[in-house]
Structure formats: structure tokens, C-alpha cells
Amino acid sequence: MREKIRLVSSAKTGHFYTTTKNKREMPNKMEIKKFDPVVRKHVMYKEAKIK
């Protein structure tokens, strides 16, 4: 089952992306490098729960 997650910027800008992930195939927390438009750089985004 795919679960909705939020990817929060590690640059502490408050920017986030939403996506889905398959919990069975990827049980660990997701970390991915994406573009943060607030600081105009690629930074690490870490998984957080959607409230």
C-alpha cells in the first residue's frame, strides 16, 4: 500500500514536497536531494508525516 508522505527541507526554510511511497519496498525513512526554491539550491529533503 502506498502512503502519502511529506518531504521537508533540511535548510530550515519551511518548504516541503508531498509524494507517496511504498512502505513494503522502502521501510526506512526517505532522504532525497531536491531543489529548494527559497534558498535556490539543491538540498536534502527528509521524510515527515502529513498531519
UniProtKB/Swiss-Prot annotation:
InterPro entries the record matches: Ribosomal_bL33, Ribosomal_bL33_CS, Ribosomal_bL33_sf, Ribosomal_zn-bd
Pfam families: Ribosomal_L33 (PF00471)
Keywords: Ribonucleoprotein, Ribosomal protein
Source organism, top-level taxon: Bacteria
Keyword Glycoprotein recorded: no
Keyword Membrane: no
One cellular component term from this protein's GO annotations in UniProt: cytosolic large ribosomal subunit
GO MF: structural constituent of ribosome
GO biological process, one term: translation
HAMAP family reported in the protein's UniProt record: Ribosomal_bL33
Family: Belongs to the bacterial ribosomal protein bL33 family.
Family annotation (PANTHER family): 54S RIBOSOMAL PROTEIN L39, MITOCHONDRIAL, LARGE RIBOSOMAL SUBUNIT PROTEIN BL33M
Name recorded for this polypeptide: Large ribosomal subunit protein bL33
